[in-house]
């Protein structure tokens, strides 16, 4: 018999996590709108040759900070979030098309995007669901398209569960690399954030991965 903790139902994970974000949307916006993630933008756009306009999906767009920034660079952005309040705010802030979709019930289409920007979002997917979600992101990209993702990492073993009302999968660096590769992506770049700190103080793992041509 396994002693591993039981993973909650997807309905509970979604309702509690999205409920938290809906209830704290304004506070979240105020606390994150000035975060400098230019390094992450440059990682995605550089991998795509910095050509504009690119068709980009902001997966887990929140209130729209990155939609605004990437649109201002001349790209065509589509946002996606499961939080109704985040979707409302993102549409208002960016003027972009923003899809209200659960990560567990995606409808993205085939080869619809040149790049996917998944900044601090994929870790909300339970480990058992990651292969399916990553496969859908893979299918949504054109051949040669690029996935950028940034997620908190575990320094010892893969773990998952609720942190307050938000569910998270905290994988090791190798855990994230394995999940991305299993979906068919080829990882081309990895780095840790925040920059300029010792590795033990860099909890965020950023990956740039390409869909083969």
Each language-model region and where it sits:
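Conserved beta-strand signature within the Rossmann-like core of class I S-adenosyl-L-methionine
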Residues: 144-151
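Conserved class I S-adenosyl-L-methionine
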Residues: 2-51, 155
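Conserved S-adenosyl-L-methionine
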Residues: 185-196
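A short acidic, Gly/Pro-enriched loop at the edge of an enzyme's catalytic core
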Residues: 104-116
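A short glycine-rich, Lys/Arg-flanked "PGG" loop and its adjoining helix->strand segment in the class I
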Residues: 131-143
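Acceptor-substrate binding/catalytic loop of class I
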Residues: 159-175
């Amino acid at each position: 018999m396994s002693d591993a903790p039981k993973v909650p139902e997807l309905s509970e994970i979604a309702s509690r996590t999205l409920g938290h974000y809906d209830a704290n949307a304004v506070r979240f916006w105020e606390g994150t709108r000035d975060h400098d993630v230019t390094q992450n933008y440059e990682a995605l756009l550089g991998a795509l040759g910095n050509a504009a306009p690119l068709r980009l999906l902001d997966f887990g767009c929140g209130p729209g900070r990155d939609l605004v920034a990437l649109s201002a660079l001349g790209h065509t952005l589509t946002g996606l979030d499961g939080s109704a309040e985040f979707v409302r705010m993102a549409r208002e802030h960016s003027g972009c098309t923003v899809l209200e979709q659960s990560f567990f019930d995606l409808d993205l289409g085939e080869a619809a995007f040149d790049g996917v920007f998944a900044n601090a979002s994929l870790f909300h997917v339970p480990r058992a669901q990651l292969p399916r979600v990553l496969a859908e992101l893979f299918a949504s990209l054109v051949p040669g398209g690029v996935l950028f993702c940034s997620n908190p990492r575990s320094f010892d073993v893969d773990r998952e569960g609720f942190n307050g009302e938000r569910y998270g999968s905290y994988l090791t660096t190798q855990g994230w690399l394995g999940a991305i590769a299993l979906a068919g992506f080829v990882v081309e770049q990895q780095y840790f954030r925040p920059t300029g700190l010792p590795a033990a103080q860099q909890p965020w793992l950023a990956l740039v991965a390409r869909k083969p041509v």
